[in-house]
């Protein structure tokens, strides 16, 4: 969204209606916004007329004959009361109009495939050699959408990541975590914890080497702030709120980093500002009640490294490609085979004008699973957060914001468990992670071996 959306409401509302149609959203909001804006402009004219009339009469009072002063004073008081009431009405209409405008999603980029759900998303490239169980070859080829890919057929069925974690390696315990916390929480032990830490360090190392500033952000934000970063009405069931306080736990470092320049102006010559944040991520996952019930793929709490860029409007599409390339470099380094997909319009979140997902092939599940989301939000977030750039001639405008996952540790672990396992249950540690583990005596060096489950009872 941008301030230009108000211009479209006034001059070309059909563009906004078409955008909502492309997102498969009801268009009545645009009609309501048009009517409210018309009412706002009419009320503004009335306020200006009353203000002018009040000022005119007030200016006549000192010069008026004594017998007319009392009448003019009373008339000025009546006008002032009418003006104050009309100004309150104007403010109320403006707030209603602003809330409607803020409810509108971003304008979909022309390169986004049009469709109501994820099934209309389009794979645009594949990387790596895919390990495919012999009975899953046809299903795999269907998911390549006709792209030429390199794959290896294996005769043994890989074990799913949940069973690998808890029953083969015995390095996780979701049952006990569910007992003492809730479902979708977990205990991890020893080698898997080291793997989690190594993944974070590897992602941070990769992104900071490209000139991004490392950030450790707040893990909570005030309601006013977080609703300017995301569509809180839509995602209120996904975000944890602290009871009795106006604070929300972040679902990603994107939220806190986006707010770093809340209500500030940035000299345009300082753009782009490239940052990479590391933080825990907290998610209710209320909309995923029956999805991924086992293991650590979809959980309430995990560690995440997030890329973020504040960009000038003319450069944001260039940086969108840069950020997905950074993410791809991380997964190429890990040796995890993946595809990049262009997300369909109906599956875009409200802030994004375009989004790429990077999905890794999971051989035990015979499907691709999301590891990375990379979005260009244009000025949708910046307008809400009042973050503007300032040119040397003092011309101002809303900058663009972009975000992308670098690594979500638990999801990356599930991908490693399925892609790097051997038939005997041993899991190879990706070579690129080993340098982050070699100095620690207790960390795995090359392989993670099946072990007995740690004793968690006293």
UniProtKB/Swiss-Prot annotation:
MF (Gene Ontology): ATP binding; serine-tRNA ligase activity
* Primary residence: cytoplasm
**Assigned keywords, A-Z:** Aminoacyl-tRNA synthetase, ATP-binding, Cytoplasm, Ligase, Nucleotide-binding, Protein biosynthesis
Q: Which top-rank group of organisms is this from?
A: Archaea
A Pfam entry, by short name: tRNA-synt_2b
Under the cellular component aspect of Gene Ontology, which terms does the record hold?
cytoplasm
- In the UniProt record, the signal sequence range is none
EC annotation from Swiss-Prot or TrEMBL: 6.1.1.11
**Residues the record lists as binding ATP:** 283-285, 299, 370-373
* Keyword Aminoacyl-tRNA synthetase included in the entry's annotation: yes
Is-annotated flag, keyword Metal-binding? no
Annotated L-serine binding lies at 252-254, 306, 405
Which biological process terms from the Gene Ontology are attached to this UniProt entry? selenocysteine biosynthetic process; seryl-tRNA aminoacylation
The listed locations are: Cytoplasm
* Record InterPro entries: aa-tRNA-synt_IIb (IPR002314), aa-tRNA-synth_II (IPR006195), aa-tRNA-synth_II/BPL/LPL (IPR045864), Ser-tRNA-ligase_type_1 (IPR002317), Ser-tRNA-synth_1_N (IPR015866), SerRS_1_N_sf (IPR042103), SerRS_core (IPR033729), tRNA-bd_arm (IPR010978)
Catalytic reaction(s) noted: tRNA(Ser) + L-serine + ATP = L-seryl-tRNA(Ser) + AMP + diphosphate + H(+); tRNA(Sec) + L-serine + ATP = L-seryl-tRNA(Sec) + AMP + diphosphate + H(+)
What is said about its interaction partners and assembly? Homodimer. The tRNA molecule binds across the dimer.
> To which protein family does this belong?
Belongs to the class-II aminoacyl-tRNA synthetase family. Type-1 seryl-tRNA synthetase subfamily.
Entry function: Catalyzes the attachment of serine to tRNA(Ser). Is also able to aminoacylate tRNA(Sec) with serine, to form the misacylated tRNA L-seryl-tRNA(Sec), which will be further converted into selenocysteinyl-tRNA(Sec).
Q: What information about domains appears in the record's comments?
A: Consists of two distinct domains, a catalytic core and a N-terminal extension that is involved in tRNA binding.
The name this protein goes by in its record:
Serine--tRNA ligase
Q: What is the lineage of its organism?
A: Archaea, Thermoproteota, Thermoprotei, Sulfolobales, Sulfolobaceae
């Amino acid at each position: 969204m941008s301030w230009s959306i108000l211009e479209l409401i006034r001059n070309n509302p059909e563009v906004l209606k078409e955008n909502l149609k492309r997102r498969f959203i009801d268009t009545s909001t645009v009609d309501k916004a048009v009517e409210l804006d018309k009412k706002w402009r009419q009320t503004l004219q009335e306020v200006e007329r009353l203000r002018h009339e009040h000022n005119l009469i007030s200016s006549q009072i000192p010069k008026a004959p004594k017998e007319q002063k009392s009448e003019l004073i009373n008339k000025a008081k009546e006008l002032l009361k009418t003006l104050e009431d009309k100004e309150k009405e104007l403010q109320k209409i403006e707030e209603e109009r602003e809330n409607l405008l803020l409810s509108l999603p971003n304008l979909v980029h022309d390169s986004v495939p049009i469709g109501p759900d994820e099934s209309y998303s389009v794979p645009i490239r594949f990387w790596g050699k895919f390990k495919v169980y012999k009975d899953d070859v046809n299903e795999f080829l269907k998911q390549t959408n006709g792209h030429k890919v390199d794959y290896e057929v294996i005769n043994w069925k890989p074990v799913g990541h949940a069973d690998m974690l808890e029953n083969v390696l015995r390095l996780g315990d979701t049952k006990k975590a569910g007992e003492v916390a809730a479902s979708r929480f977990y205990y991890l032990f020893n080698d898997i914890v080291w793997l989690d830490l190594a993944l974070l360090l590897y992602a941070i190392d990769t992104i900071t080497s490209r000139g991004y500033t490392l950030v450790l952000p707040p893990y909570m934000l005030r309601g006013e702030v977080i609703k300017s970063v995301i569509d809180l009405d839509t995602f209120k069931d996904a975000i944890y709120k602290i009871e009795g306080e106006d604070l929300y736990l972040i679902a990603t470092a994107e939220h806190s980093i986006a707010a770093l320049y809340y209500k500030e102006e940035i000299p345009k010559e300082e753009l782009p500002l490239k940052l990479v944040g590391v933080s825990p991520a907290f998610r209710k996952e209320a909309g995923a009640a029956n999805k991924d019930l086992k293991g650590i793929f979809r959980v309430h709490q995990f560690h995440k490294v997030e890329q973020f860029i504040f960009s000038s409007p003319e450069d944001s599409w260039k940086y969108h490609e840069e950020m997905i390339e950074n993410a791809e470099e991380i997964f190429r380094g890990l040796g995890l085979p993946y595809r990049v997909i262009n997300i369909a319009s109906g599956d875009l979140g409200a802030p994004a004008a375009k989004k790429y997902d990077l999905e890794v092939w999971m051989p035990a599940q015979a499907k691709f699973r999301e590891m990375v989301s990379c979005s260009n939000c244009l000025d949708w977030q910046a307008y809400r957060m009042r973050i503007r750039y300032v040119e040397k001639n003092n011309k101002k405008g809303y900058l663009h914001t972009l975000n992308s996952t670098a690594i979500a540790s638990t999801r990356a672990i599930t991908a490693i468990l399925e892609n790097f396992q051997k038939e005997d249950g041993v899991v190879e540690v990706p070579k690129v992670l080993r340098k982050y583990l070699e100095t620690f005596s207790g960390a795995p060096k090359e392989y993670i071996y099946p072990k007995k489950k740690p004793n968690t009872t006293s």
